Amino acid sequence: MQNISINIEKKEFFNYENKIKTHIAIKNFNLEIAKGEFCSIIGPSGCGKTTLLNLIAGLDKTYTGSISFGKNKAVHNLNKAFMFQTPRLLPWLNVQQNVEVVLNKNQNKNEISKKFLSIMGLEKFLDYYPNKLSGGMQRRVALARSFATQPQLLILDEPFTSLDEPVANLLRKMLLELWAKQPTTIIFVTHDINEAIYLSDKIVFLSKPPSKVLKEININTKRPRKMDNNTIQKIKNKILEANNSILEGEL
């Protein structure tokens, strides 16, 4: 897989009863994401981050422009995996079955599910049902499920929101460990610039709607990272001192 090229001329919403344009969500949006890159996206509330993910995933094709990888192929044809703000586990399936459900019949479901659940420290919880797990453990299952399909593109939409900070930090570390074992291209939406600095190769800051790319900032700290809070704060301060309104979607 080559770079992902995102070139959205316009994404607008209509009232289809009277065909009146109601909202231009994204306009003149141009972004390149390299193969294997961890790219975080930050923007003000309501700027169209989830809309952007839906376009990239091919869930919404009503826009002008192109989203492709390589020369001719559409990104929506890639093998993709998703992780959302909630784990979205199936309550009638146990932990192992929740991972196996996304695998195809030609794969060794038992071996693959146990492998990824073991990486997440859940080997003793294979027969537990979601309602017996904490929120953090449910998200570990969701992470294992996301990587089990060996996706070419992994899309994460604020996956660690609402968690206590120690639990969220553990999951961020586990995400990076999984990614190191099975590299893939990641698009990660977050409101937390500290989280983005810790995880990302590149942070993309979006404007107020209609959304476009305001600025791309590379995080060049070598991996595996051992970034304490002071290190993250120094990088954050450097970014915000040069771009003091960037989190509000302005330069």
Predicted regions and their residues:
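ABC nucleotide-binding domain "signature" region
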Residues: N108-M120
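Catalytic Walker B motif of ABC-type/P-loop ATPase nucleotide-binding domains
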Residues: L154-D157
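The feature captures the beta-strand-to-loop junction immediately N-terminal to the Walker
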Residues: I42-P44
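Helix-to-loop junction immediately C-terminal to a conserved catalytic motif
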Residues: A57
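Hydrophobic anchor residue at the start of the ABC signature
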Residues: L143
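Conserved ABC transporter NBD signature motif
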Residues: T64-H76
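Conserved signature/switch motifs of ABC ATPase nucleotide-binding domains
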Residues: Y128-N131, T149
